[in-house]
A protein has these predicted regions:
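"A position-specific structural signal for the A-helix of alpha-solenoid helical repeats
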Residues: 137, 171-174
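Alpha-helical positions within canonical tetratricopeptide repeat
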Residues: 109, 150, 183-186
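Acidic/histidine-rich alpha-helical segments that form the ligand environment
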Residues: 31-73
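Short, contiguous alpha-helical
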Residues: 1-32, 72-115
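Start-of-helix signal in alpha-solenoid helical-repeat scaffolds, especially tetratricopeptide repeats
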Residues: 132, 167-168, 176
Length: 190
């Protein structure tokens, strides 16, 4: 939660700068190095405090987004405020929650999280950069469930929205059961 709160704060600050018509501070370039240093500073932060702070910041992000609306805004892969809000405050937390659930043996809840994310993002007609990512994640879930034809269909749907994920798909351990399938091989061909 500390990690999510820090990223929400950083993103909120940039969004506020946009709402005020000022140039915004871009996100850090080396994410892994930055996260490692920041997480070390968060050791000892009570989970309830970090969770409350993260939730509060999410509310503030939504308030500022309502002021700014859909506008050009570059934040990593995101090119608009809408894409950035969804990535920062929807898909990013779900990636961490999914990993946590798997690490703690709650495989069904982890699968359900990605199933619900795909359904929700389809329902709101999420931008391709976001929908493609959640469909890719659902493909990994279907692969883990042994539902390989569905996994391939989801990869086929997601990669046109997220061509940047094609290289990752080729080596993603979550898609390993698909590697020998000719249809999958065709999809990841570069």
């Amino acid at each position: 939660m500390f990690h999510l709160g820090m990223w929400r704060e950083r993103f909120l600050n940039a969004l506020v700068e946009v709402s005020e018509g000022r140039p915004y501070s871009p996100p850090p370039e080396d994410i892994d190095k930055f996260n490692e240093a920041e997480l070390a500073r968060g050791i000892g932060t009570p989970l309830t405090d970090a969770g409350s702070r993260s939730d509060h910041l999410f509310g503030e992000i939504l308030d500022v987004y309502q002021q700014v609306g859909h506008a050009p805004f570059q934040w990593y892969l995101a090119r608009t405020t809408t894409e950035a809000v969804l990535r920062n405050s929807y898909t990013h937390p779900r990636m961490h929650l999914h990993a946590y659930l798997l690490e703690n043996g709650d495989v069904e809840a982890a699968h359900r999280l990605f199933e619900e994310a795909a359904a929700e993002m389809r329902a709101v007609a999420a931008p391709p950069i976001v929908l493609g990512a959640v469909l890719y994640n659902l493909a990994c879930t279907r692969s883990a469930q042994g539902r390989l034809p569905e996994a391939i269909d989801l990869i086929a749907e997601s990669l046109p929205m997220r061509p940047d994920m094609k290289d990752a798909a080729a080596s993603d351990p979550g898609l390993a059961p698909l590697r020998d399938d000719p249809r999958f091989q065709e999809l990841i061909k570069t």
